[in-house]
């Protein structure tokens, strides 16, 4: 009879299984048990059922409590079972062997109920079960106790494994507690996302921008500083372009900025090639707008434009020397608007300087020959007037070039002033005393060298003319201080000096000196003045640097009796068209 094993087998059974076990054990007890004892057994079964219910409730409570509370409740359940065994020991039919046989099923049902109990309660329960007194002392019951004792050791081992599963359940309960804490952790983990959505979702862009502006990052501050600096630079460039009192010093200081170098490098390099330094041009209305746009582009372009300016300047110089014999009415209109704008700004153009110097010279020499005066081309034949394509190109480049223009020396009046403005170029240069002094010194040195080199060629024709040319090259007239110096290409300066050194074959010395005083020592790109080449005996030959003049320019020039008596047989209008070759390299 292996009752504990059967009890261990039926351990996971329900209450109905316990009733079946008790009913199965009842036929064995029928010949020995009375009805009273059976009633007591049923009462014990009821107590076991109550203990099962109580144990189930304790299991439910233990899931909500810590491990120590569950151990205490299990200990209480074990003490209740021990009390039940004591009641069974004090029952009236306990001396019979049937009662001893009844106890293993009852204990088996109790062990079934108390399966998740710890080892301590199990040991107490087994001790209470093994300490039951045996009043009959029969060998059979003693043998059963021995077998039950041996089986109880095996039962304890199996119950230890069951207790390990109970500890696993306790761990699961602990994990459930941790799961609750994990829910809090997950809530803490999820809540920042929800807060971010709540904060930034309904927030308007204006509030976001306000937050960024109130608390800017370092990168934002750096970007703001660079933007402010660029805006300040652009405003400074606009002030430099639009200021009426622009000097060479202001131009040099402004040229240190990156955007301004694009427009002024061309002027500096062009003037440096001809010894003309520090003269900056006033821009026309359209070219000033283009220059502002190009300066804004140069903010982003940067150093690349500065590298390209050298190549562009040399190319434009060669193109300009080849295009000087083309003219257009639109270019003259633009030049007249530029002259009006420069007059409003209070700047003096080279024509005004020439007209003022011409008025002073007319006081000394009241009448001059027509062909001894400098020819000022009309707007339609001016070499300074450009074609529309080249004008648009120059406006795009927006580089202030020192372009020269020569006006007629006719009597000053409203009509002549208007015609002077029509003969102006698109860009009129501004001058300063410092630049004029520097140019005067450099030009006087070149004139001295050139006149000394050509002295032998001038002596056979007219010694007086050569001496007067040396006097003019050594001692400068007041016109050198007043007339603006123009930027020349190297070929232009050489041709101008070559023709300047040639004297008239036969002319009065005083007349020659007077007409040399009228001459301005500079010319533009080889357009020299051959007014010196007059002869009473010989016929006027077309000079290399002579610019063909239209009849309108000849009607402007005053014709005096002295000019008629000098024997000029061929007017300058019939000159050949080969004057454009002077500007070619």
Swiss-Prot record:
Residues 327-345 have a biased composition (Low complexity). Residues 351-365 have a biased composition (Acidic residues). Residues 575-585 have a biased composition (Basic and acidic residues). This is SLAIN motif-containing protein-like. Belongs to the SLAIN motif-containing family. One of its GO terms (biological process) is cytoplasmic microtubule organization. Residues 1-34, 55-125, 324-365, 402-476, 492-585 are annotated as: Disordered. It comes from Danio rerio (Zebrafish).
């Amino acid at each position: 009879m292996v009752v504990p094993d059967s009890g261990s087998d039926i351990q996971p059974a329900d209450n109905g299984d316990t009733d079946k076990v008790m009913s199965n054990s009842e036929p064995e007890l029928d010949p020995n048990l009375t009805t009273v004892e059976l009633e007591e057994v049923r009462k014990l079964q009821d107590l076991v059922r109550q203990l099962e219910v109580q144990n189930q409730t304790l299991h439910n409570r233990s899931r909500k409590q810590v491990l120590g509370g569950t151990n205490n409740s299990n200990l209480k359940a074990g003490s209740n079972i021990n009390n039940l065994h004591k009641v069974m020991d004090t029952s009236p039919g306990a001396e019979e062997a049937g009662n001893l046989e009844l106890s293993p099923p009852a204990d088996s049902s109790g062990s079934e109920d108390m399966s998740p109990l710890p080892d301590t309660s199990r040991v107490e329960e087994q001790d209470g079960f093994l300490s039951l007194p045996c009043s009959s002392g029969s060998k059979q019951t003693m043998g059963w106790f021995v077998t039950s004792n041996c089986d109880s050791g095996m039962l304890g081992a199996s119950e230890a494994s069951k207790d390990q599963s109970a500890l696993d359940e306790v761990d699961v309960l602990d994990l459930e507690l941790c799961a609750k804490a994990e829910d809090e952790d997950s809530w803490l983990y999820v809540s920042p996302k929800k807060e971010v959505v709540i904060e930034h979702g309904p927030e308007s862009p204006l509030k976001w921008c306000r937050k960024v502006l109130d608390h800017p990052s370092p990168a934002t501050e750096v970007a703001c500083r660079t933007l402010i600096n660029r805006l300040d630079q652009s405003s400074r460039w606009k002030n430099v372009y639009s200021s009426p009192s622009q000097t060479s010093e202001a131009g040099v200081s402004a040229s240190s900025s990156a955007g301004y170098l694009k427009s002024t490098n061309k002027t500096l390099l062009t003037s440096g090639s001809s010894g003309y330094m520090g003269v900056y041009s006033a821009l026309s209305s359209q070219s000033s707008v283009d220059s502002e746009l190009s300066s804004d582009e140069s903010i982003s372009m940067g150093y690349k434009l500065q590298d390209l300016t050298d190549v562009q300047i040399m190319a434009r110089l060669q193109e300009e020397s080849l295009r000087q014999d083309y003219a257009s009415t639109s270019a003259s209109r633009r030049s007249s608007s530029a002259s009006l704008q420069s007059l409003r700004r209070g700047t003096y153009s080279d024509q005004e300087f020439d007209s003022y110097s011409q008025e002073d010279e007319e006081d000394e020499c009241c009448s001059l020959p027509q062909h001894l005066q400098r020819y000022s081309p009309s707007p339609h034949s001016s070499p300074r007037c450009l074609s529309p394509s080249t004008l648009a190109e120059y406006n795009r480049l927006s580089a202030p070039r020192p372009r020269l223009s020569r006006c007629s020396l006719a009597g000053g009046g409203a009509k002549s002033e208007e015609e002077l403005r029509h003969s102006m170029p698109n860009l009129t240069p501004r001058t300063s005393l410092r630049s004029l002094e520097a140019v005067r010194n450099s030009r006087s040195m070149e004139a001295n060298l050139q006149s000394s080199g050509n002295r032998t060629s001038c002596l056979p024709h007219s010694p007086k003319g050569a001496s007067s040319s040396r006097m003019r090259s050594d001692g400068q007239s007041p016109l050198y201080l007043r007339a603006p110096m123009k930027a020349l290409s190297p070929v232009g300066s050489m041709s101008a000096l070559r023709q300047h050194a040639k004297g008239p074959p036969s002319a009065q010395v005083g007349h020659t000196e007077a007409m040399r005083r009228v001459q301005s020592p500079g010319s533009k790109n080889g357009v020299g003045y051959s007014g010196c080449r007059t002869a009473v005996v010989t016929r006027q030959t077309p000079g290399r640097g002579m610019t063909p003049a239209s009849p309108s320019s000849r009607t402007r020039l005053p014709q005096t009796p002295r000019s008629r008596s000098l024997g000029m047989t061929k007017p300058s209008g019939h000159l050949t068209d080969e004057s454009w070759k002077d500007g070619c390299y």
